[in-house]
Design a protein with these regions (language model features):
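Surface-exposed short loop/turn segments
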Residues: 40-52, 122-179
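Generic short beta-strand segments
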Residues: 71-75, 144-150, 185-187
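Short, Lys/Arg-enriched N-terminal segments with co-localized hydrophobic residues
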Residues: 1-16
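Bacterial N-terminal signal peptides
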Residues: 25-35
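A structural "domain/chain start" motif
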Residues: 38-109, 217-230
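Bacterial N-terminal signal peptides that target proteins for export
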Residues: 15-27
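Sec-exported extracytoplasmic/periplasmic mature domains
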Residues: 111-120, 212-221
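Short secondary-structure boundary motifs at beta->alpha junctions and helix caps
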Residues: 89-101, 172-220
């Protein structure tokens, strides 16, 4: 009886020790994975390419209306970055757009969209040019950016990502000296288990695309001028 009791005790102890070792190994693996995925930030800056990809429409020639888009004015309080990732174990990683000028990014994104499939689902003759350099253009589009942000907060086993923007786009019509302005803002969120900078890039790109989609939905082009669609 004593021997059988001792054997049972030893067996139970072995099972407990094996279970504890498996739990410990799991914890160490999780810690290692979190550490390797960057739970501590060094303050570096990641530059994100956020121009939405375009699928051009099939047209013979662009519409015969000359459109110039000026780089948007950046009126954000902090122009050194568009946001940051707060790491689980302290520290941050900063985010910025490629070229570090959101105003140029937005102007180029709008130009790409109009060339591919703009108003009335047509391609338009459009280029980006410095302010005041194209006085004879039929339409000159400018803008002001008040918010252009991308942030991520790492938590245990997940990272919460937010993107947002707020801006005004103004189209000045040469034909009658009129203008049309639209104020736009939007935000998107996502939660991921394994974080990468592509997650922020995709969400920011989607935010830019959504803003441009709404601008084109709110406006139209008629008689060589941009007008409210309703």
């Amino acid at each position: 009886m004593w021997r059988r009791g001792s054997a049972c005790a030893i067996l139970k102890e072995g099972i407990v020790m094996h279970s504890l070792m498996r739990v410990g190994a799991g914890i160490l693996l999780s810690v290692g994975l979190m550490a390797s995925s960057g739970c501590g930030g060094s303050g570096e800056t990641l530059h994100l390419e956020v121009l939405p990809p375009q699928q051009p429409v099939q047209v013979a020639e662009p519409e015969a209306v000359k459109i110039v888009i000026e780089p948007f004015e950046d009126r954000r309080a902090d122009k050194h970055r568009i946001g940051m990732r707060t790491h689980l174990w302290g520290g941050v990683t900063n985010f910025n757009v490629t070229g570090e000028k959101p105003g140029e990014v937005y102007a180029q994104a709008l130009a790409d969209r109009l060339r591919a499939s703009g108003w009335l689902d047509r391609s338009w003759d459009v280029r980006v040019a410095p302010a005041g350099s194209a006085p004879t253009a039929d339409i000159v589009i400018s803008g002001q950016i008040f918010e252009f942000a991308a942030n991520a907060k790492s938590r245990m086993f997940s990272t919460y990502i937010t993107t947002s923007n707020k801006l005004t786009i103004t189209a000045r019509n040469n034909v009658d000296r009129s203008s049309t302005s639209r104020s736009l803002e939007g935000a998107q969120t996502d939660t991921v288990v394994w974080f990468s900078e592509d997650d922020v890039k995709k969400l920011m790109t989607a935010t830019v695309k959504d803003t441009l989609d709404r601008y084109l939905a709110d406006t139209t082009i008629s008689q060589r001028a941009v007008r409210p669609s309703r």
